[in-house]
């Protein structure tokens, strides 16, 4: 049997360690696949340097998570909203140059966002069409507010457009409510992490209150074929154990999720 790949986020939000130490710990834990944050922020080392280091370590980049600065303006008739299109097109161009086959995008930020509308769809259509011309998949993520994924997937029909299912957001913001069947065969990516509903904690799976068997069954039943991708953040009580133990524990949790995927 071919096992699903296991992957992990390279987080720039980890505490008390550099991103280089994060990458080293990820490799030491046994991960071979990662996703990177391409947020166009003033990081040291920069996102370009991080990508170079990741590749030097022999790690495979499965997708880039694009930034979401001003993303609520996507739905507004203003200059910030218009500027999102060339920004994302430039990100896609860079991903193509670096052989990154998929990007993940948010559709909103914060708890209140402008209601979805045709203005945003027209902009997203340009972004998705350009990605399609580069043979790049675009996966839109469920964030804090319901309805956006359904609206976008109902209006954008390109084969390269799908969703990224985020388990933590599903638990704390969606109260475990999502009609997975609406996205059948369009689930391109996942962000698997846990919380106890007190916040978006990015805990290691099984350290919170998510029903993992239910989530994995929903993903399997609706055609998700991709890696077991966990999105962890090194902070809180995890700091006592050290970065290497954190990612080793994360790898073990991902392996348990892999076993759930393979269970008949």
PLM regions: where:
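N-terminal pre-domain/capping segments
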Residues: 1-90, 96, 150, 158, ...
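Charged helix-capping and loop-helix junction motifs
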Residues: 46-51, 81-88, 117-125, 176-179, ...
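A structural motif corresponding to the C-terminal end of an alpha-helix
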Residues: 29, 94-99, 127-138, 218-225, ...
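Acidic-and-aromatic substrate-binding clefts and catalytic sites of carbohydrate-active enzymes
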Residues: 11-18, 36-49, 71-74, 79, ...
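Histidine-acidic metal/acid-base catalytic patches
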Residues: 1-7, 16-27, 55, 146-164, ...
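Active-site acidic/histidine proton-transfer and metal-coordination neighborhood
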Residues: 75-162, 172
């Amino acid at each position: 049997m071919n096992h699903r790949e296991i992957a992990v986020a390279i987080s720039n939000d980890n505490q008390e360690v550099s991103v280089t130490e994060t990458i080293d710990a990820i490799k030491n834990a046994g991960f071979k696949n990662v996703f990177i944050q391409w947020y166009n922020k003033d990081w040291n080392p920069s996102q370009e340097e991080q990508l170079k280091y990741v590749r030097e370590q022999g790690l495979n980049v499965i997708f880039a998570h694009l930034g979401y600065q001003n993303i609520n303006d996507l739905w507004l008739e203003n200059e910030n909203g218009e500027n999102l299109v060339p920004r994302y097109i430039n990100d896609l161009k860079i991903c193509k140059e670096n052989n990154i086959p998929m990007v993940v995008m948010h559709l909103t930020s914060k708890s209140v966002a402008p209601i979805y509308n045709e203005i945003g769809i027209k902009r997203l259509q340009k972004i998705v069409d350009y990605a399609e011309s580069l043979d790049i998949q675009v996966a839109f993520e469920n964030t804090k507010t319901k309805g956006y994924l359904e609206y976008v997937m109902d209006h954008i029909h390109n084969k390269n457009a799908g969703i990224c299912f985020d388990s933590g957001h599903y638990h704390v913001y969606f109260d475990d409510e999502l009609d997975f069947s609406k996205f059948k065969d369009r689930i391109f990516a996942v962000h698997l992490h846990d919380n106890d509903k007190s916040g978006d904690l990015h805990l290691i799976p099984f350290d919170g209150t998510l029903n993992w068997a239910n989530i994995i069954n929903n993903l399997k039943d609706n055609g998700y074929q991709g890696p077991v991708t966990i999105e962890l953040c090194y902070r809180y009580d995890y700091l006592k154990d050290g970065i290497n133990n954190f990612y080793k524990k994360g790898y073990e949790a991902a392996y348990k999720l892999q076993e759930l995927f393979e269970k008949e």
